[in-house]
């Protein structure tokens, strides 16, 4: 909302408020420039005592998980809402690390067709024709998933929001309808399938109100309840010595760099422009300094030397 407020007043988006939580010394809100590293954000929270850990970018349900090594390359983008440092034995890490091949095998061997994944699916409850249990059922009786791509029930996988409620809470067998949906969506896109929205208005199911799930219960299932009731009282300004600003931070075409190495720029200066006749969003410098590196993927700016 704050970013929308800024945009409505023609203020350039160069900094992001995000949470730095999990297994850290001092959970904080960080006001960070775009392109600031995860390591700099972690330092603002006092670091972590863990030798090995994973980093969750976003929330437990739909966030992306990175290993400690992968996290070395993480930077703040326009869509970063927070970083969560997690111990290696966290249940959430296990669930998000299951290979697709195993998910498909479990769909064939372990699904009991209780239909809880459908009964609790937010899409289904708001009137969409998505029925995850039907997709699981049809996968169980086929050798090649690609033979199902013309099936109407399977095509509904395209409207899965990937919220993960089915596999993180609803399924009593601990299998992975969300990941199966994601896999089928990939096959459908590869085939060139485009989902056609219903022409009639969707009708919310009356039982929707009674099938909502407590976020705290989900956090407990995922093993992250220890970080659920944090009371963060500090908001710290991050002033890094260097930022690495990605040229693709959004849906649409990546930006083309409009600066060169050695150039001195001020905060808010344009560093990336959308290609002609392409949808996207401009990228601006988040700190004042000298451009030290330019590639087709990012622009590195070192603090100092502003004009």
Name each region found by the language model:
Residues 1-165, 169-173, 178-188, 194:
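Redox cofactor-anchoring modules in respiratory/redox and cofactor-processing assemblies
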Residues 19, 32, 56, 79, ...:
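Generic detector of intrinsically disordered, low-complexity, polar/charged segments
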Residues 146-148, 156-257, 263-266, 270, ...:
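Flanking helices and flexible, charged tails adjoining ferredoxin-like Fe-S electron-transfer domains
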